[in-house]
Amino acid sequence: MSFVLRHLGNNLWSGRLDLFPGDALVHGFSARQGGVSAPPYDTLNMALHVEDDPAAVWENRRRYCAALGLSAERICTPRQVHGTEIVRVFRRDAGRGARDYADCIDDADA
């Protein structure tokens, strides 16, 4: 397994694992550059569970997803409990946690 880091433009970077064949799963790991959040969350904070401005978090998510060719409205986010649980998501899960932390998938990290 290898990790590839690529520049998406506008100071946005994304990492990708070659673990999945072709386009079987769109995924990425974001860096902290290229967003709009103010300190101490600067700049590309995408976490709704901290005290960052939710509008800034939404704009950061929108920018990152747009750079990947995705709709931020359809992303599905876990609560990220720093455990080992990975969940399978389905089309019906599209948008869970995209704008509202209370709607995230419970007790999972990915």
What are these regions (language model features)?
Residues 1-110:
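Active-site microenvironment for binding and transforming phosphate-containing groups
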